[in-house]
């Protein structure tokens, strides 16, 4: 097996302020805690097209954020391309995200004053591994691949939601990451554009063999992935 993501007994607990102990003479308050994830384990192999699914509050976005090194693990560990995240500091996590992970967000997260091509170029510029000419060539090519030929010089505000999400996909893909994480990528799109985006991602997954992991409760997305990891109340749901 060629595991690109390995999740080992992961727990995530959030502190939600303080509350006084009932029926206690103690003056000290206790911290209220929410257990977002509780003992989750799973493995995702290279090239898989996978969804983390579940109802609102199930922990799917929390798990995606932990895989993406956007949040800290309370206990357990997650390995991305062989690298454990639990012991990493902020600088190490930033470097991992920059080099190994591509992100696709439901709100696109594009910089409004930059053109489509400039938004895509940013991901490569942060790597400091390519010349200016290479950055432009790679960005141009990937925008063509996602169907935005002729739109490279347009600002996000001049494009539809589906086109903006294509820029987001191109930005994630251009640096050839080990894994792409997509948080509800169709949530802001109509059914037609949702279908087009998922079909595009399937094609790119097959062509480039890049692991894609979605968090979603969209039935259409779940019907089109090859594997579903289901969560309920912060735990794996095997029903």
What are these regions, as identified by a protein language model?
Residues 228-239:
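H-loop (His-switch) and adjacent beta-strand-loop-beta switch element
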Residues 3-224, 228:
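ABC family nucleotide-binding domain
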């Amino acid at each position: 097996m060629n595991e690109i993501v390995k999740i080992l007994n992961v727990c995530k607990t959030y502190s939600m302020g303080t509350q006084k102990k009932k029926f206690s003479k103690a003056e000290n308050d206790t911290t209220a805690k929410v257990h977002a994830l509780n003992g989750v384990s799973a493995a995702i192999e290279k090239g898989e097209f996978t969804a983390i699914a579940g109802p609102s509050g199930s922990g799917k976005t929390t798990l995606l954020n932990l895989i993406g090194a956007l949040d800290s693990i309370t206990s357990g560990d997650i390995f991305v391309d062989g690298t454990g995240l639990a012991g990493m500091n902020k600088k190490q996590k930033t470097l991992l995200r920059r080099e190994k992970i591509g992100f696709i967000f439901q709100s696109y997260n594009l910089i409004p004053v930059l053109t489509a091509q400039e938004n895509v170029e940013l991901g490569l510029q942060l790597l400091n591994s390519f010349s200016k000419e290479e950055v432009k060539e790679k960005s141009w090519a990937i925008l063509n691949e996602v169907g935005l030929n002729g739109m490279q010089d347009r600002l996000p505000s001049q494009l539809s939601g589906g086109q903006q999400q294509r820029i987001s996909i191109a930005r994630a893909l251009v640096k050839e990451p080990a894994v792409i994480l997509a948080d509800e990528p169709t949530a802001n799109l109509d059914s037609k554009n949702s279908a087009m985006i998922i079909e595009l991602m399937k094609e790119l997954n097959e062509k480039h063999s890049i692991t894609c992991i979605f968090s979603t409760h969209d039935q259409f997305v779940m019907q089109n992935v090859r594997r579903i990891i289901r969560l309920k109340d912060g735990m794996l749901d095997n029903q």
